[in-house]
Structure formats: structure tokens, C-alpha cells
Amino acid sequence: MEDVEVRFAHLLQPIRDLTKNWEVDVAAQLGEYLEELDQICISFDEGKTTMNFIEAALLIQGSACVYSKKVEYLYSLVYQALDFISGKRRAKQLSLVQEDGSKKTVNSETPCETENEFLSLDDFPDSRANVDLKNDQASSELLIIPLLPMALVAPDEVEKNSSPLYSCQGDILASRKDFRMNTCMPNPRGCFMLDPVGMCPVEPVVPVEPYPMSRSQKDPEDAEEQPMEVSRNGSPVPVPDISQEPDGPALSGGEEDAEDGAEPLEVALEPAEPRTSQQSAILPRRYMLRERQGAPEPASRLQETPDPWQSLDPFDSLESKVFQKGKPYSVPPGVEEAPGQKRKRKGATKLQDFHKWYLDAYAEHPDGRRARRKGPTFADMEVLYWKHVKEQLETLQKLRRRKINERWLPGAKQDLWPTEEDRLEESLEDLGVADDFLEPEEYVEEPAGVMPEEAADLDAEAMPESLRYEELVRRNVELFIATSQKFIQETELSQRIRDWEDTIQPLLQEQEQHVPFDIHIYGDQLASRFPQLNEWCPFSELVAGQPAFEVCRSMLASLQLANDYTVEITQQPGLEAAVDTMSLRLLTHQRAHTRFQTYAAPSMAQP
């Protein structure tokens, strides 16, 4: 047992180190497993009958499928039986109810025996606790509800926010307007009614002030707004207000009584007597609709903190911000021409020198030293400024190079470049002030007595650091990349991967050099090696002297020929005795596809 645990330690405990996975020889273990399977044999009748694992697995799978089908069929039968019993009980119950109703019309005193009903799982009776309603009470009035009650109309968001419903912890759960119990009238019998049926649908119009101050307006939290109710005959009726007294309408002086905390009197709901159509036609329809007051806005609202990551609505109107006037900068005329201007401005006849304009404008004031060091502060002038500075530096380098040559060769090249010398002298006069505002670190004076061979080094030193920094960085990066490619630190895992690549690469190249495999060509070659028809020939003799991959290809071709009935395959009986005893017999030289082309069915043959 210990040998097995040591052998399969990598399977029992997962390897966390990735490099140790390369130490597991998967091919050797698979080979040993196949050898063990080859040695295991389950046979019956002294080796004559062997167990076929594939057939056994298919048998188990088929048995499971058949059993599952039978269980499913039994399940459906049970449900059909339950539906049949429930339907039969329901039909019997309906017939009993109809007979019971007919008996009540003839003789209401005869009791009706109730039979135990079949209890269905999905048919639960309605719970009517604390409700005493008579089902046999026939109403003489015609119940018509032409309008939707206001209690069923969904309130607005403003009304919901005006009366929030808080939990014990102080969290806002919902609005008190969401629950119908808060807007319904309790009936003396125990149920909640949406309409005040106990009140008369026609009430005399009471002259009141246009906007009386009632308790509901004083304290909106205690007395919420009651919506307009609709009676059963279709006419709107006023809802009883807690501030009104039963004797008469509320007077204007009732405000003080309401503020003093007088308890409201309960209004007794008396059942209205049924009226005939003639009486209702004679009475004048004097009623008024109660005005629905707007929801009062809360005094203090929580200031919502805006979400900075919330996406903006493209159709929303943004807040108008106050225009802040900035500091404008005007470009001198003639420096830059603005395209697309219809109005032609009269510019300067001659282009003004930028360097002279800059010195006159900024270098002569008292704080000129600071301005000269920092340069211009205009973003539009940056390009022109640095371009001009670059031209000045190039001119200074050429002038220094010329002076060095004249110092070491005084008489050789005096008359060679008069035009360039004159031009350099003129530029030197113009650049006399340029040395003032340039940084002292940008150029270095050459010492006297410098050799001509060192002129290039002096030019490199005289070049400003800002201009050669980019070139220096590029050279350093290229040098670093070139050196880092030579000294790459190889880890243990990369070294093993490289060894594996060195091992597998020759095998892959060898396989790429093989001839492409065509099973029909190999089948023709195998058929041509048979000496004659109907003669058994061992497979080892047919593939003698061929490499391993050619033997495998010939094996596949022989199986294809056996499938086409071109050859016949046989072996010796027994499991161990049948190893390497495969023999083939050629049945026909004609290929399968040619036989199928010339094949004629017996039914199509002419008599």
C-alpha cells in the first residue's frame, strides 16, 4: 500500500510548484496502466467466453433509460388520476349547490346536509375572519359604479413623499398612501369599505368659506387628505371630515377648537333607505365635489449629494453659469494671418522682426531680467520663439567653427568665403542682444589654443542640453535593449521548457518530412503485396522491413479494406495466444468505389 501511495503521490496531493510537473513521466505511467489492463482478463467457461465491458456499459445505460421512462409514465398516470378525482368531486359539488339553491327558494327552513369536500392542494378557501356578511341577502338597488374610486387610483410621487412610512429603526419603507387600509372606511360588521355606503348620496350644499382652515390643513401628518368617494348609484358624495360636527357645518371659529386638541366626534353611518326612480327624479341633485388640495411640500428636504460618476442626460437642460471674462491676447498684425475673414484689415507693409519686437516689448521694462529668463508666456508664440532660438544657436555654432578655422589657418582661406563671412558678421550684429536673454549654461566659450581635431567635441559641448537630451535618451534606450537581449536571466522553468523544445523539435521535423497519408493509396499498396487471391498471409510478412509509422498506416488501410469487403481478417482463438497472429486474405482486386459504380440491385436486373 505504501508503494502505491508513493507511486501516485502526485495524484493524491496536488503539486503546487509548476516546475515539478515536468518531473512526472505521464507516458511511462500510461504504458504501465495499459499493460495492467492487458493482463486483467474476466472470462467464463475456461476462457471461451470473455466479458465485453462496452456491451455491459450499454446494457446498464439502456436499463436506466427504460426504468426512467417507466417512472415518468407512472408519474403522469398519478397526476391524471388526481385530476380525474378532483374534476368528479367538483362536478358533484356544483350539482349539490344548484339543488340546494332550488330547495331554498321553495322552503328556506329545510336544512342542507353538507358533504365532506375533497381537499385539493391548489384550491384554498378564502379567509373571511371578522367579517359577518350574509350571502343570501338580495339588494333591491341596482349597483352601478361608473367611475373608478379614488382609493384605487395610484397617488402621485409628491403625495407619497408627503406622508412617508417609517420603520422602527427610522428607515423609510414606503408611503402611507400605498396601503388601501389607510384610505378605507371600516364597516361596523368588520370589513373595510372603499365607499361610505351608510351616507345618503344627496346632501344639501353647505355654504362654506372658499378656503377654510381645518385640522387636516393644520396638521397634515395626523389627518391625511381623503380622496373623493363615489357612491354605489354613481353620484359623488362628500367624505365625512373629522373636523365637522354632526349638527351642522364647521364654522370659521372652529380653528381654535381644532388647535386646542378637541377630539373628533364619530359620525354614525346610517343605512340609506332605498329610493324609487320617481323620488330621485323629483329631488334636486344638489351636491358638490370636494376640492382636492395639493400636497404640501415638506419644510426641510434632505439635500441630495450629486453623484459625480452619474452619466448626463443629453435632453436635460443644464444650469446656466455666469460668464467669466478671461484675459485676451492679441496677436500682432502680420505675424499670423487669420483665414476666412471677410473684412480685410490693413496690415503692415513689411513683416516686423519677431526678435526685435520681443525685445522692445518685454526686454526693456524694469522687470525685464525675469521675463528674459522665462521667455514668452503666450502659447501661440511658443513655436515661433523656439524656432528663432534654434536658428540663433545654429548661427552661433557656425560662427565659432569659422573663428576656430581662422585661428589655426590665418592666411590660407581668407579670400574663399567672403559672402558667408559678411553674412555671419551681419547676423552677429543682430544677435548681439541674443546672448543676454539666453541661459549661461546653453553655450560654453572655447579656451584659446584649441586644436582643430577637437572642434567637433567643442561643438558637441556647446550644443544646449535641451536640444540633445532627446537624442541621448534614444541612444541609451537602444543600447539598453541591445545589451538586455544578450543577458536574459533564465529561470529553472524556462530552462526545462527549452530542453523539452530541444527534445520534441527533431521529432516534429521528422514527422513533417513524412509523406502525406492517403488511406486509398496505402490500401492499393497492401493489396498489391498479396501473391494471389483467397490465400491467407500474415500481416507481419506484408509489412516486414518498414518503419513504425508505415506499419501503423498499413494497419489502418487493412481495416478500411476489411470494411469494404476487399480483404478478410482473422486471428487465433484465445486472448494471449491471439497476440501478433493477424492474417489477411485478399477477396478481390477490384476497388470498392468501382464495384459500387457497376453494382446493380437484383430487383433492377432484367428477366
Curated annotation (Swiss-Prot):
The modification Phosphoserine is found at S95, S231, S235, S252, S494. Keywords: Disease variant, DNA condensation, Nucleus, Phosphoprotein. The modification Phosphothreonine is found at T19. Belongs to the CND2 H2 (condensin-2 subunit 2) family. InterPro entries: CNDH2_C, H2_M, H2_N, Ncaph2. PANTHER family: CONDENSIN-2 COMPLEX SUBUNIT H2 (PTHR14324:SF3). It is linked to Defects in Ncaph2 are the cause of the nessy phenotype which is characterized by a specific defect in T-cell development. Nessy thymuses are smaller, with corticomedullary junctions less well defined, and cortical cells sparser than in wild-type. The thymocyte defect is typified by an increased proportion of CD4-CD8- DN T-cell progenitors. Only thymocyte differentiation is affected in Nessy mice and not cell differentiation. This is Condensin-2 complex subunit H2. Regulatory subunit of the condensin-2 complex, a complex that seems to provide chromosomes with an additional level of organization and rigidity and in establishing mitotic chromosome architecture. May promote the resolution of double-strand DNA catenanes (intertwines) between sister chromatids. Condensin-mediated compaction likely increases tension in catenated sister chromatids, providing directionality for type II topoisomerase-mediated strand exchanges toward chromatid decatenation. Required for decatenation of chromatin bridges at anaphase. It comes from the Eukaryota. The lineage of its organism: Eukaryota, Metazoa, Chordata, Craniata, Vertebrata. Residues 211-312, 325-347 are annotated as: Disordered. It holds the Pfam family CNDH2_M. GO terms for biological process: female meiosis chromosome separation; female meiotic nuclear division; meiotic chromosome condensation; mitotic chromosome condensation; mitotic sister chromatid separation; positive regulation of chromosome condensation; positive regulation of chromosome segregation; positive regulation of chromosome separation. Component of the condensin-2 complex, which contains the SMC2 and SMC4 heterodimer, and three non SMC subunits, NCAPG2, NCAPH2 and NCAPD3 that probably regulate the complex. It is found in: Nucleus. Residues 254-263 have a biased composition (Acidic residues). One of its GO terms (cellular component) is chromosome.
